[in-house]
Amino acid sequence: MSNYPYASMRDRYDLSAYFVVGPQDTKGRPVAGVVDEALKGGATFIQLRAKPGDAADITAAARQIAQVIADNGKSESVPFVIDDRVDVAWQCRYLGIKVDGVHIGQTDMQPQAARALLGDDAIIGLSAELVAQVRA
């Protein structure tokens, strides 16, 4: 059962055009505009990576990106995750912003804790550089 009516934990993801973007990557262009171009160019998965960034700024960017994904008619086909910031992903979902989950690193919050906060329907991505990390 979903904690959030808009969330969708998919059985499979198309990672063929996984697009990672944040304000630090766009040379002053609006992140949402860059995401719009990426979607029109065939992006299949969106990750907001805003470093550095405070919760309010990341939430605002996430709201804009989620709207762009919806405006492109891809809310059900293109997952949207936030990098590292489980707190922001939780806040977005609480506010009704369609964020599908997070991508966290080995030194971030434990994936089990992220799952507990975001629910069973959330995507929890985890960076892994070693086979042992995948098996852990």
PLM region descriptions:
Residues 1-107, 117-131:
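Conserved N-terminal beta1-alpha1 strand-loop-helix module at the mouth
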Residues 110-118, 135-136:
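Short, charged, surface-exposed secondary-structure boundary motifs
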